[in-house]
Amino acid sequence: MTTTALDLGGLGLDQGAAVLLRATLAPLAPGTVVAVHGTAPTLGVHLRAFARAEGHDFTAADGMVAPTAAADQQAPLAGTLVRGTAAAARWCGAERAGAATATGTIDHPPPHWGLAARGAAVEAGGPAFHFALSHRDEVWSDDAGELYRAAAAAQWDPATAIPWDAPRHHPDCVEDALVQVLTYLIENETAALLVPARFCAQVHPHFREVMQLLAIQSADEARHIEVFTRRALLARDVLGLSTTGGQTSLQTLVDEPDFALASFLLSVLGEGSFLHLLGFLHVHAPDRCTASIMRLAAQDEARHVAFGMSHLLRHAAHEPTLLARLRLAIERRHATLQHTAGLNAEVFDALVLLAAGELTPTGMARGHAAVAELQAQMDAGRRARLKKLGFASDEAATLSALHTRNFM
């Protein structure tokens, strides 16, 4: 019978010696004897309890002669442990939760893998977790990890990234218009926060890159809400107007229960259109502070659109009926919103005034033309993304025209 020795000195099992003892036993074959030496007063008692709890045989010293392998130990012999099989038996039936790398995902991770890290050994008999989004084809994007890392690296601090003290020389009417647009943006970004936050909690942790990406997407939107609000209150005490039509449009996003459809309506159509809006506001910003806000927000939104497109392209390749479902989602949303006002006049007028920069006939003509061009760019962008997803050109044009007049 093989014997090894462990000298604990004055360290008791209740002081960390149990960790040393487990580490000594772990690589040994069952039946190996471990002679434990030590001077802690309660070591023998604690060794007996340790052995009973962890499935090893224990013999107290009680004057016994130390095994040869332990003869040179300085502390007296407290007893011997014979390595048992209980520790190994505990992990019978355990399984690996896939492989740790992104290439190690499986199609449908089981509920009993629960919160285990991908690649971990999962003990049998654990609780089953219900994650509604547990099929790879529903959520996965091959570049999810890359997009998450890019998002994490591109995080910006509102306190330092934006020149809050930049001078403002524009007229009051332009500031009022900006506050109205910012109020509208805050409302829309709140919806854009709630949608990924809700689905993040439904994704099986096996697809951790998607979970992380949705979480950081929500964090992006939280930061946008912060900076839009802070800019709106720089020179005013109250925000602008929130309309029934705008909230009704956003409710159709917040209430959409299907991840693919919600991603399509929010990221591909809504945030895709918002990219053009943020670019417009960057160009026509009345001050350097506002321009910086719009530029940074657009950088974030571009990643959101990229993930929406990437995972829907992959999803469509694995589900032939997805495009039909996306088409129906647009048509259903259009039918729900067809009797609403769409983009409220206050927001439209505010965009015209921001582009004009002044309340003059010449300025209004210039501003109105700029907003018309913005709407044309939004439509062209939607059609391009729809065609990339697989819709024919004429169908893409028809579906783009059905998109909410509220932009998001």
Regions found by a protein language model. Give the residues of each.
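Terminal targeting/low-complexity segments that flank the catalytic cores of oxidoreductases
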Residues: L20, T85-Q212, L233-L234, V238-L239, ...
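Short glycine-/small-residue-rich flexible loop motifs, especially phosphate/cofactor-binding loops
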Residues: R48, T229, G279, R383
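Short, surface-exposed basic-aromatic patches at helix termini and helix-loop junctions that form
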Residues: A49-G55, L233, V283-P286, L313, ...
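Alpha-helical transition-metal enzyme core signature, strongest for iron centers
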Residues: A51, L185-L193, L214-A232, F264-L275, ...
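Amphipathic alpha-helical segments within well-ordered protein domains
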Residues: A197-A201, G279-H282, R295, M309, ...
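Short acidic alpha-helical/loop segments enriched in Asp/Glu that coordinate divalent cations
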Residues: G240, R288-M294, S310-R325
